Amino acid sequence: ATIPRHWQSFSFSPRSDGIAFLSLGIEEDARWLAVASPDGSGSRAIEPLGNNASKVQVAWSPNDQVIAFSRTGQPQGLNEQEVLLIGKNGENFRSLIVNGLGFQSRWSPDGERIIYSVSSGSSDWRPQLWIAGGKPDTAGEGKRSIGLNTWADKCSFGSATTLYCAVPKTLEAGAGLYPAAVGNTPDNLYRVDLTTGAAQLIAIPAEEHTVSQIIVSDDERFLYFTDRISGQ
């Protein structure tokens, strides 16, 4: 089957029997958050996007309840943002109030929690990593800062309680608002125990690498990463 070109930002269901995506038609009333079978059949519109497509992160939760985060909640002031959790049947679950702007997130493997990065005045608008409850009935509970200045998409879970992150060696003030302008800043690698919140430096690469993606082996003995500079 051929997937329409205006379908973008795909996320697979936990059993890989469905996809969530943004259907971005030319007209605002033809833009939707939607689901379908992996071959594109049986598509179903979930929520209208209008001109808010850039505020929606498609991310199907491991517990099969949430398919996207939407930064379209009620205004909360300069240093806070309300993020909505959207269900696969259009449910608007309990929202998440985050301490900053530029929300990026990742689910824990069991879907119980999310890690996310935001930037605020308290961090000089550098990205800061947080963890919070992620289930529809616990969204935002136990929210706490992990204490690392990096983005959620530079992290990967080793288990439900272990996180590995690439952390830029240096970040200018304001970097969280303009991540594309950071360039090829080299990273160090950290391991985070999510039970205690302790972050440990585990590697300073011999050569300077800018990590774009981390892959953790099943036994957590090895980390593999894609280097943004070389593409390898």
Q: Predicted segments — roles?
A:
Residues 1, 72, 81-89, 126-128, ...:
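Short, intrinsically disordered, charge-balanced linker/junction segments flanking boundaries
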